[in-house]
């Protein structure tokens, strides 16, 4: 029923940076949620409040956000008498109290921590699994297990190599179940490790923030070639497609793009959006690339619309849309992309994340649920992706416990659903046809 007590604290994420954790108590017990944090963040994301006290955690402390919860948000929610099943009412109460467009008063990390904990408590109050409760909140009767998009080669802001593009992913669309997809993904991952070790030496198999490898290569096509080789070696050529997250805003310079942005600056090597689009087209022709995320800068709308009109593959908006209904509406209008990357901490509450997802789905888009590069052991997004029937999730490589926590939870959910479990497979872009 009502919330008895809320207590927030500062913990560390998978990168050793502080983040917010919230414990919420009802008569049913204690419910805990932790908030993730991104490295390559879109400028239109809701504000993640950091202390900026350089003497603590290099300015990245979150004691202010924690204090906002403990001193202001907690007493208001406890005092409101609202039931934990009233997710929207509690979220709206926090949004009204914050009163800013981008949650800069309390911080999206404060509001989201409480929102996630409320959602977990709401499921317990109804005596249903978390995924069932979220499905109810979204008005969904269906539940669908997603295709995992494993980020197995890291570049961009996630890695210390020369590679400009941030993520190269494998999607086992030909798997028969989520568990089968995990096995295929893990086997390809291990084959990739041996391919990289053979070509670049053992130190090239060190892993990045999300568990993928970061060999010191410069050419993006080389990363695709490595994936192709590992997939062939594992024997899954007919079962796997490739996805990329370019995170192009990270190397956008003066209206052009710098594919060697980690080297000393040299404007003579910048390329135009059209040239970059041609490069993607060549990838799509040469490799089974079926999904490209953030192919252009978050404000290069014209390039997005032109490219999306010219290709038949999935074009995912992340920095472009930042899980924000206003940005999504504009992207729909301009036909800028055809899939939303859903990150709960970009918008900052469960209610708004569900609304963003529904808005995208109602406009015929796909939706991919996503982790952040700075993660915790919290598994909320595993339940979320099943509940929202998006059919696809990216939460890193099959390596590093904060990544596997989500994948393992999805295997448990599939097991729990038994014969009712449906796996998105080849329909990952439009699982509603299942």
Curated annotation (Swiss-Prot):
Tissue-level expression: Expressed in the brain and, to much less but significant extents, in the pituitary and adrenal glands.
Sorted UniProt keywords: Cytoplasm, Glycolysis, Lyase, Magnesium, Metal-binding
Annotated Pfam families: Enolase_C, Enolase_N
Residues involved in substrate binding: 158, 167, 293, 318, 370-373, 394
Residues the record marks as active site: 210, 343
Family classification: Belongs to the enolase family.
Name assigned to this protein: Gamma-enolase
Organism expressing this protein natively: Gallus gallus (Chicken)
């Amino acid at each position: 029923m009502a919330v008895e007590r809320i207590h927030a604290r500062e913990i560390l994420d998978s990168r050793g940076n502080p983040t917010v954790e919230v414990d919420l108590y009802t008569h049913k017990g204690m419910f805990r949620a932790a908030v993730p944090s991104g490295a390559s963040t879109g400028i239109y994301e809701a504000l993640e409040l950091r202390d900026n006290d350089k003497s603590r955690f290099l300015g990245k402390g979150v004691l202010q956000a924690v204090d906002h919860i403990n001193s202001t948000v907690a007493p208001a929610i406890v005092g409101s008498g609202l039931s934990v099943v009233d997710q929207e009412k509690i979220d709206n109460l926090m949004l009204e109290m914050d009163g800013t467009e981008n949650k800069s008063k309390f911080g999206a990390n404060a509001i989201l921590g409480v929102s996630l904990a409320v959602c977990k408590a709401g499921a317990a109050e109804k005596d249903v699994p978390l995924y069932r409760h979220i499905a109810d909140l979204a008005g969904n009767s269906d539940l669908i297990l997603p295709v995992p998009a494993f980020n197995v080669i890291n570049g961009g802001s996630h890695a210390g190599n020369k590679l400009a593009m941030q993520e190269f992913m494998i999607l086992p669309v030909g798997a028969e179940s989520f568990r089968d997809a995990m096995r295929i993904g893990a086997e390809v991952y291990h084959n990739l490790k041996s391919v990289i070790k053979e070509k670049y030496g053992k130190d090239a198999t060190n892993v990045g923030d999300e568990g993928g490898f970061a060999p010191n290569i410069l050419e993006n096509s080389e990363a695709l070639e490595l994936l192709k080789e590992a997939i062939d070696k594992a024997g899954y050529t007919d079962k796997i497609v490739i996805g990329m997250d370019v995170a192009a805003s990270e190397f956008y310079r003066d209206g052009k793009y710098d594919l060697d942005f980690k080297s000393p600056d040299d404007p003579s090597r910048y390329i135009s959006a059209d040239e970059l689009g041609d490069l993607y087209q060549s990838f799509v022709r040469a490799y089974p690339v079926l999904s490209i995320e953030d192919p252009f800068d978050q404000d290069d709308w014209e390039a997005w619309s032109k490219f999306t009109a010219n290709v038949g593959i999935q074009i995912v908006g992340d920095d472009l849309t930042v899980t924000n209904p206003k940005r999504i509406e504009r992207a729909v209008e301009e036909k800028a992309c055809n899939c939303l990357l859903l990150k709960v901490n970009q918008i900052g509450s469960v209610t708004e994340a569900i609304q963003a997802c529904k808005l995208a789905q109602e406009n015929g888009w796909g939706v991919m649920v996503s982790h952040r590069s700075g993660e915790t052991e919290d598994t909320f997004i595993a339940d979320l992706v099943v509940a929202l029937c998006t059919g696809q999730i990216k939460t890193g490589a099959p390596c590093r416990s904060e990544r596997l926590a989500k994948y393992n939870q999805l295997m448990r959910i599939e097991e729990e659903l038994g014969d009712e479990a449906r796996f998105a497979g080849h329909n990952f872009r439009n699982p509603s046809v299942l």
